[in-house]
């Protein structure tokens, strides 16, 4: 659809122009800082930052109904810059010119309704939001599109020259960072730090394929994170972990899309989000809050964070009901199938604490919850979900297991509708599925496959076939016909087929 075909009252708003001012605000001391510095923590108190906007064109002039109309019409516009997360440009980064936006096809991932079998199992309607269908096969692309668009903008404005983008990763962040940095070409190089032996082969192959320098170190993600934080503090590098506030902005698009897909009616919705470094749940809360304050939605959905008992610092923090008695303590992680969430000291924890308070205050009631699930529950849930037509990764299984726990705890009611964040594609974690089917988990995982969920190929062997067939010389004539009939007959028995 072309601009001149749009209603006159929104035509000038469809393709936005850069406007307003953006600034960092410290979560701790609330000081503000200019965005044309690569800041990740407050220079004064050391706390993490969040990004804010002011004086954005049309922002205060337009009501919620008009914003909804603008975003719905932008769906029909064939313009690269606002096809992805920047459909919601004014709510993400309204200072970046459209020609500086990096778009690789991220965002607007499908909401897939659970089938009748799954609905019956849990007792309510729910959906999987398949963020594994992003370009690098995970939700990280939302934040990376924003962070690299910002770098692209600042590099051109400030003439910064060559830049090294760096991150620590459990696998998905490194794949996304390397992909988006590669798109920007020679002026941005990427390096990623991974915990040796704790990233799936599929995830490891991605940054290597994108040309990143991949550095593996002994330990876990939290150790890698400390190293990249040290590098960011002492060297000229761009940190691309969720400590980078631009990542949070891009990931807010997850909330905006859910609101739009439900026609902005989210009153009885419950969003299930796995928690690792806590950037994603930060973004989900922040996104819904922005839409609520701007009048695009009239209610705030419930937010349920989910953690494995093998990496559960946020769950432990909120186990204490008295806010005055809560004390955050990092935990030592144990092996987890939800590798992307295997983090014991999430850098966005201060953001979570701040936004949970804001969210519940705006909702007028407690609307944020955290549940804990076992490794067994995660794997069983992933296998069951995918046996019913989904592509859930282990973190998607974590969300599904969390839905059941939240229902048991009374956080989610029968008339609620669940939305489960499946953060990555199942193919990234196919090794865990194979371990489940073969019952080959290390005891530390504490996963014992259910017999009814295991599945392995049935190999058919025929001596006659091996005797008469060789490469390039398959059996022919009656020999071949006999073999086909013999094999077909055995398969029919295995599959319990009935004769015509």
Predicted features along the sequence, with ranges:
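N-terminal juxtadomain amphipathic helix
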Residues: 12-103
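Positively charged, low-complexity intrinsically disordered leader regions
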Residues: 81-157
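Active-site/ligand-binding loops adjacent to catalytic centers
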Residues: 108, 203-205, 215, 219-239, ...
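Short glycine/serine/threonine-rich phosphate/pyrophosphate-binding segments
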Residues: 141-147, 166-184, 200-202, 277-284, ...
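Claisen-condensing/thiolase-fold acyl-transfer catalytic domains that form or cleave C-C bonds
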Residues: 375-432
């Amino acid at each position: 659809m072309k601009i001149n075909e749009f209603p006159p009252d929104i035509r000038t708003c469809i393709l936005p122009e850069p406007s307003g001012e953006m600034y960092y605000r410290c979560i701790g001391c609330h000081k503000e800082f200019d965005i044309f510095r690569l800041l990740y923590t407050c220079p004064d108190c050391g706390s993490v930052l969040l990004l804010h906007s002011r004086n954005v064109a049309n922002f205060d002039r337009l009501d919620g109904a008009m914003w909804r109309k603008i975003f719905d019409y932008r769906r029909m516009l064939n313009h690269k810059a606002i096809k992805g997360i920047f459909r919601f440009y004014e709510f993400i980064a309204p200072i970046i010119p459209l020609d500086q936006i990096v778009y690789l096809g991220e965002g607007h991932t499908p909401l897939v309704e659970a089938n009748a079998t799954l609905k019956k199992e849990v007792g309510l309607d729910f959906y999987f939001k398949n963020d594994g269908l992003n370009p690098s096969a995970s939700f990280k692309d939302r934040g990376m599109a924003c962070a690299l668009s910002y770098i692209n903008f600042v590099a051109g404005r400030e003439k910064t020259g060559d830049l090294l983008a760096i991150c620590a990763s459990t696998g998905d962040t490194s794949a996304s960072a390397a992909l988006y940095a590669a798109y920007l070409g020679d002026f941005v190089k990427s390096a990623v730090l991974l915990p040796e032996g704790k990233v799936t082969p599929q995830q490891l192959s991605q940054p290597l394929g994108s040309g990143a320098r991949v550095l593996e170190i002994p330990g876990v993600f939290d150790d890698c994170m400390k190293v990249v934080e040290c590098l960011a503090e002492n060297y000229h590098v761009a940190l691309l972990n969720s400590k980078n506030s631009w990542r949070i902005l891009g990931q807010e698009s997850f909330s905006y899309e859910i609101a739009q897909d439900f026609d902005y009616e989210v009153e009885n919705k419950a969003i299930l989000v796995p928690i690792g470094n806590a950037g994603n749940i930060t973004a989900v809360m922040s996104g819904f809050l922005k839409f609520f304050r701007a009048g695009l939605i009239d209610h705030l959905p419930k937010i349920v964070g989910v953690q494995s008992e093998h990496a559960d610092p946020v769950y432990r923090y909120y186990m204490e009901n008295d806010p005055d008695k809560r004390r955050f303590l990092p935990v030592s992680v144990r092996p987890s199938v939800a590798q992307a969430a295997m983090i014991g000291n999430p850098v966005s924890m201060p953001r979570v604490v701040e936004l949970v308070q804001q969210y519940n205050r705006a909702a007028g009631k407690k609307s944020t919850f955290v549940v804990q699930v076992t490794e067994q529950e995660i794997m069983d849930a992933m296998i069951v979900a995918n046996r019913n037509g989904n592509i859930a990764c282990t973190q998607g299984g974590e969300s599904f297991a969390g839905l059941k726990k939240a229902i048991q705890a009374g956080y989610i009611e029968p008339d609620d509708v669940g939305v489960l964040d499946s953060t990555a594609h199942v193919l990234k974690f196919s090794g865990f599925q194979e371990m489940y089917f073969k019952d080959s988990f290390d005891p530390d995982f504490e996963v014992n496959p259910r017999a009814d969920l295991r599945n392995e190929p049935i190999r058919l062997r025929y001596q006659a076939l091996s005797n008469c067939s060789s490469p390039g010389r398959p059996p022919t004539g009656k020999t071949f016909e006999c073999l086909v009939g013999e094999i077909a007959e055995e398969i029919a028995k295995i599959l319990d087929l009935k004769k015509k």
